[in-house]
């Protein structure tokens, strides 16, 4: 036993997943602990459990046990404090693997051979070394690519409501996402608090689409301890940082569901007997979420990038709830799913009006996607917003009372939702999306297209067949 390792026999007691000790010298918050019970009746050594120090007082500590505490006798427990914080062995060999929430193999294969073992809490990127996010990540989803473009190095959350197909959308993005130009690309997917049916659906979707080879999957199940849920996104990001900044890959990290993470954060905070903040969540939840989201970005002089797409469920459909509220302050926009669109059978039910990508200008337009990307998106936004206003007015006065222009806008809003947003499970390139936008705009006279420069309208008029191009795409399982 080295100088930093301390071994203690006997604990004060156990309460649920918590183990309480006293008289522990030099204990540190977040320190990794190993726990072993008394030998079994047949003489076989007891199974070793692991844990983490989550609370310190003057003479006592609380340890969150990562496995079950059933059958563990406090008086006979042997506890070893390792003096180490949680670390993860990372390597490029993690691609194609399915791991549990702590990075241990969950696919029956041996652990990947590590190239390094960094601490999972990571280190903040030096602000003077941060590169501005730029370039386009194609998700294959028109409402994102065309209207709220995702940029390499960005953190763009998806705000969902209970019962909406956020998990299906997350799986679809994992299956479809790519970078243009043939650069190396990978996806790190982390599910937090997923029930059995959901995480098996994720795996089946990834295997059916043939994308598992370029994906690292971290699965934290609903029955796993809350402290593991707090470590899962950090393990995923530690892996992603290694792939991005050591191997030069462009990495998209999809985290779902951040609400499950925050519930676990609240549960652990209550176990520590901390003073609760808004709605029972700890007052430091903003800082804690920032330690996750701020790990996205690009580093000057390094070829890779780390982009985040966290998915969260808004409790009670409340956009002002602490979880989406604080997330919105840290991230760079939001993709909002609509219960009304879902009720009408539109998938994905993305409401583009409250949705926003603040960095869209860095990844869309000349040299990034297409010259007409921003003008077409702006014009679609303008007509759709007016069409939504007309729809509300028609609900009061009746559609028969509308003028010709209002009827045209109302028809546009319906077609926009059904044809552009409601693409189903198909993959669309950015060219497919923009051609679909032009096709919708073709129902208006050129004089009404005030957001599109004259030179683009003239160039478009020289391509009469392009405006009638059909929306294409391949089905994604």
From Swiss-Prot:
GO terms for molecular function: ATP binding; proton-transporting ATP synthase activity, rotational mechanism. Gene3D superfamilies: 3.40.50.12240. It comes from the Bacteria. InterPro entries: ATP-synt_VA_C, ATPase_a/bsu_AS, ATPase_F1/V1/A1_a/bsu_N, ATPase_F1/V1/A1_a/bsu_nucl-bd, P-loop_NTPase, V-ATPase_su_B/beta. Disulfide bonds: none annotated. Pfam families: ATP-synt_ab, ATP-synt_ab_N, ATP-synt_VA_C. GO terms for biological process: proton motive force-driven plasma membrane ATP synthesis. Keywords: ATP synthesis, Hydrogen ion transport, Ion transport, Transport. CDD domains: ATP-synt_V_A-type_beta_C (cd18112), ATP-synt_V_A-type_beta_N (cd18118), V_A-ATPase_B (cd01135). The keyword Repeat does not apply. Belongs to the ATPase alpha/beta chains family. Produces ATP from ADP in the presence of a proton gradient across the membrane. The V-type beta chain is a regulatory subunit. This is V-type ATP synthase beta chain. It comes from Anaeromyxobacter dehalogenans (strain 2CP-1 / ATCC BAA-258). The lineage of its organism: Bacteria, Pseudomonadati, Myxococcota, Myxococcia, Myxococcales.
